Curated annotation (Swiss-Prot):
It catalyses: N(6)-carboxybiotinyl-L-lysyl-[protein] + acetyl-CoA = N(6)-biotinyl-L-lysyl-[protein] + malonyl-CoA. Residues 35-292 form the CoA carboxyltransferase N-terminal domain. Zn(2+) binds at C39, C42, C58, C61. The gene is accD. Keywords: ATP-binding, Cytoplasm, Fatty acid biosynthesis, Fatty acid metabolism, Lipid biosynthesis, Lipid metabolism, Metal-binding, Nucleotide-binding, Transferase, Zinc, Zinc-finger. It is found in: Cytoplasm. A zinc finger (C4-type) spans 39-61. GO terms for cellular component: acetyl-CoA carboxylase complex. One of its GO terms (molecular function) is acetyl-CoA carboxylase activity. This is Acetyl-coenzyme A carboxylase carboxyl transferase subunit beta. Binds 1 zinc ion per subunit. It comes from Acholeplasma laidlawii (strain PG-8A).
Length: 292
């Protein structure tokens, strides 16, 4: 018996040596671009069709990918109900900033829009509303004079037609190429929201990743109901800048959606797949009966 066991060990050893010496053949696999995406949080490779079917949310860790304004409307509104407004208002270069026109052109190509804010009307489960979406693919969704004007006109349109208003924010803040003109939009958009308050119309603000700077410090934080989409960074300035300014250590994760909910900055944190249902419920609860 021992002889048989020794013989078996010897043959296994020979087999392993042969396998080790055998050259490994590798054949390159040509995978076309746009087939897979890598999750920023867990680094998993995800088949893009699976990602789209899952609302652009990682199936492994639930990280919410950034999406453009067109997809946002697709996931939020009833099919074929969106009617755009104010698309004829476009940005110029009022301060003559170098390379601003080139950045605008690049933003148009990346976002396939002529500005960072898409405004219009639509329906959610048959309920009419005014809706606006900031697109972070257009100059990081920054708010310049045209974005501020479109937002203000959308608010005025909602007030005039007795419509509830929903705005999705995704922005790095004020557009530095427009200087003080961009900062003025903070006061302008915030002041316009009084029109809805006077008429008893609900304004729902949905903060997505990221909502920062002058946008976070103005209309995005002034909703009657403030919602944060899961996986969103929300805050005014970066952690390093704040620490240098106040000279204090900051709480861990202080700009996350969970922290904002804990401290009362937002009322709800909602998964993207549940946003339409949540908005539909809120619109029904705050429906304003208009008698003609």
């Amino acid at each position: 018996m021992n002889h048989l066991l020794d013989e078996r060990k010897r043959r296994l050893s020979q087999f392993h040596e042969i396998i080790k010496k055998r050259p490994i053949e590798t054949r390159p696999v040509d995978i076309p671009d746009g087939v897979f995406s890598q999750c920023e949080q867990c680094n998993s490779a995800i088949y893009n069709k699976d990602l789209e079917h899952n609302y652009e949310v990682c199936p492994y860790c639930s990280y919410h990918f950034k999406i453009n304004a067109v997809k946002r409307l697709k996931y939020t509104l009833d099919e074929d109900t969106f009617k755009p407004l104010f698309e004829n208002i476009t940005s110029k270069n009022p301060l003559g900033m170098p390379e601003y026109e080139e950045k605008l052109d690049k933003g148009m190509r990346m976002a396939k829009m002529n500005e960072a804010f898409l405004a219009g009307t639509g329906k959610i489960d048959g309920q009419n509303l005014a809706i606006g979406v900031l697109d972070s693919y257009f100059m990081m969704g920054s708010m310049g004079s045209v974005v501020g004007e479109r937002i203000t006109r959308l608010i005025e349109h909602a007030a005039k037609h007795n419509l509830p208003l929903v705005i999705f924010s995704a922005s790095g803040g004020a557009r530095m190429q427009e200087g003080i003109l961009s900062l003025m939009q903070m006061a302008k958009t915030s002041g316009a929201l009084n029109l809805l308050d006077e008429k008893g119309l609900v304004y729902i603000s949905v903060m997505t990743n990221p909502t920062t700077g002058g946008v976070a410090a103005s209309f995005a934080s002034l909703g009657d109901i403030n919602i944060a989409e899961k996986s969103s960074l929300i805050g005014f300035a970066g952690a390093r800048v704040i620490k240098q300014t106040i000279g204090q250590d900051l709480p861990a994760g202080f700009q996350t959606d969970a922290f904002q909910l804990q401290k009362g900055q937002v009322d709800l944190v909602v998964l993207r797949s549940q946003l339409k249902k949540t908005l539909s419920t809120l619109l029904k609860l705050h429906a304003k009966k208009v008698t003609s």
